Amino acid sequence: MFVTEAYAQSAPTVGETHTETPAVGQPQPEATHTETGVAHGAEHGASGVFPPFDQSTYASQVLWLAITFGLFYLLMQKVIVPRVGGILENRHGRIAQDLDEAARLKAEADTAVETYEKELAAARAKASSIGASARDAAKAKADADRAAIEAGLAEKLAAAEKRIAGIRDHAFADVGAIAEETATAIVDQLVGAKVKDTDVKAAIAAASAVKGA
């Protein structure tokens, strides 16, 4: 417990002995009491007041409160606040770094998606071009093959027609010879005279002309 200066001056010194001088005719006291007992009695007399509510110690309480608050303020300012500030600053820096990294990764992802879309569009265009080229090539080949087949068929048809015409001419020639021989034989049988070949051929030719007309 803290004591004030007035209380210290008014209180007797601990350990100081006090000897009472007996009056004339009084017996000598057997023992002297010390100031320690007086102080002890004073403490017992003041023990009924709760120390924080003791008005005699308000000044010392305020002083120690100010000292304690000052020390706590210095502790907060020099130790706790810098540590908390450092932690917050580090966390803020880490968050900012994470945000920058996330932005960088997002930009890379966007670039990759854009590149993929461009490559996909180019691949589709190339596939379409290849398909169109293949269709054009197939059509051209089909047209060429058809033209070649048609030309071959036309050539074969012309050859066949020529052959048929030759066979027909040959057949007609044979028929003419047979007709001449037959006509000569018939005339010989009917008339009994030999007919000239020129006359028979002329008659057959005239008959053929009339039949064809």
Curated annotation (Swiss-Prot):
Ranges for the region named Disordered are: 1-45
GO MF terms listed in the record are: proton-transporting ATP synthase activity, rotational mechanism; proton-transporting ATPase activity, rotational mechanism
Per UniProt, the keywords (alphabetical) are: ATP synthesis, Cell inner membrane, Cell membrane, CF(0), Hydrogen ion transport, Ion transport, Membrane, Transmembrane, Transmembrane helix, Transport
Task: State where the protein is found.
Answer: Cell inner membrane
Disulfides per UniProt = none
- One Pfam family in the UniProt entry: ATP-synt_B
Write down any Gene Ontology CC term. plasma membrane
Membrane-spanning intervals of the chain: 57-76
Q: Which domain of life is it from?
A: Bacteria
Membrane topology term reads: Single-pass membrane protein
Q: Which family does it belong to?
A: Belongs to the ATPase B chain family.
HAMAP family reported for this sequence: ATP_synth_b_bprime
Xref: PANTHER family: ATP SYNTHASE SUBUNIT B, ATP SYNTHASE SUBUNIT B', CHLOROPLASTIC
What is the role of this chain? F(1)F(0) ATP synthase produces ATP from ADP in the presence of a proton or sodium gradient. F-type ATPases consist of two structural domains, F(1) containing the extramembraneous catalytic core and F(0) containing the membrane proton channel, linked together by a central stalk and a peripheral stalk. During catalysis, ATP synthesis in the catalytic domain of F(1) is coupled via a rotary mechanism of the central stalk subunits to proton translocation.
Q: How does it assemble?
A: F-type ATPases have 2 components, F(1) - the catalytic core - and F(0) - the membrane proton channel. F(1) has five subunits: alpha(3), beta(3), gamma(1), delta(1), epsilon(1). F(0) has three main subunits: a(1), b(2) and c(10-14). The alpha and beta chains form an alternating ring which encloses part of the gamma chain. F(1) is attached to F(0) by a central stalk formed by the gamma and epsilon chains, while a peripheral stalk is formed by the delta and b chains.
Protein's name according to its UniProt entry: ATP synthase subunit b 2
From which organism does this entry originate? Agrobacterium fabrum (strain C58 / ATCC 33970) (Agrobacterium tumefaciens (strain C58))
Phylogenetic classification of the source organism? Bacteria, Pseudomonadati, Pseudomonadota, Alphaproteobacteria, Hyphomicrobiales
Question: Its gene?
Answer: atpF2
